[in-house]
């Protein structure tokens, strides 16, 4: 019994030492910004930010008045939603590909229930596609990247 305890103790010490040792300074990441760091990412919005950056539905409840500087996509999602999780990396890729041309936002429907209710969100993921001068369109489901690119190129 003492032998087993000794072996387990030795194993625990080796494991702890190895885990704490780190990578010995290899593969250190530079603090200098790279081109990749300068690209856009999907931006999470709360209600106040949505009212400023997208649409102030409190001031203009009957008329759509887009507040953005470029076309946008708003992803209504939930952290527990499988299709939402599958869509997120696609939106991240698109935010980098269309950096400076299209803004991509996300809204957690569990945290921002008032926003979800204002747009009648009943199914997630739901995407709000917002061109500069036309009325927005809503699409539901985790669309593949090629369909989203087509929607961006044709509608936005």
Predicted regions and their residues:
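C-type cytochrome heme c attachment motif
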Residues: 79-86, 126
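Hydrophobic beta-strand anchors of alpha/beta hydrolase catalytic cores
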Residues: 73-74, 104, 127
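A short beta-strand-turn-helix
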Residues: 45-71
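N-terminal targeting signals for export/organelle localization
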Residues: 1-51
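Structural microenvironment flanking redox-active thiols in thiol-disulfide oxidoreductases
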Residues: 94-97, 102-121, 149
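Typically the conserved alpha-helix immediately C-terminal to a functionally engaged Cys/Sec
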Residues: 85-97
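Non-catalytic, surface beta->alpha helical segment in thiol-disulfide oxidoreductase systems
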Residues: 123, 128-156
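Short pre-active-site segment immediately N-terminal to redox-active cysteine/selenocysteine motifs
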Residues: 69-72, 76-80, 123
């Amino acid at each position: 019994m003492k032998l087993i305890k000794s072996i387990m103790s030795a194993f625990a010490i080796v494991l702890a030492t190895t885990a704490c040792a780190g990578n010995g300074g290899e593969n250190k990441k530079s603090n200098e910004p790279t081109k990749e760091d300068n690209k856009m990412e999907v931006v999470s919005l709360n209600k106040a930010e949505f009212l400023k950056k997208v649409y102030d539905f409190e001031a203009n409840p009957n008329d759509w008045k887009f507040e953005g500087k470029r076309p946008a996509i708003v992803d209504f999602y939930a952290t527990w939603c499988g299709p939402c999780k599958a869509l997120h990396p696609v939106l991240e890729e698109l935010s980098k590909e269309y950096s400076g041309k299209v803004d991509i936002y996300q809204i957690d429907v569990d945290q921002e229930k008032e926003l979800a209710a204002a747009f009648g969100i009943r199914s997630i993921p739901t995407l709000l596609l917002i061109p500069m001068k036309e009325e927005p369109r809503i699409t539901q489901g985790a669309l593949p990247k090629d369909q989203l690119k087509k929607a961006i190129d044709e509608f936005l």
